[in-house]
């Protein structure tokens, strides 16, 4: 069972870092680029960067829908990060937390896809 938990945790962490990389790329393409640190930084540094990105999303000169996609991708990423972080504390409820983290990452990915599509249309 412990091996399964370790694998699921590792898979979720890998997905979290992949979505972070996508968020970082999209943020560089915004009308007012947002520079997020590379994905090799400390977890706290990444959390603070995504939180800051969420805070300044409203300052982007983009339509409401695109802004909502940016904010949603940040919030979903932060939510997944919180859920994945609970593994360290062995608080139980693994199955629903696994699924919630997966869905949060899926939501972030979908929002980033929408935002990337809007950015392509502007080119």
Task: Pin down the residues of each PLM region.
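Intrinsic disorder/low-complexity signature
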Residues: 1-3, 66
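Long, amphipathic, charge-rich alpha-helical segments that form helical bundles/coiled-coils
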Residues: 62-98
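Alpha-helical segments in soluble extracytoplasmic regions
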Residues: 3-60, 97-120
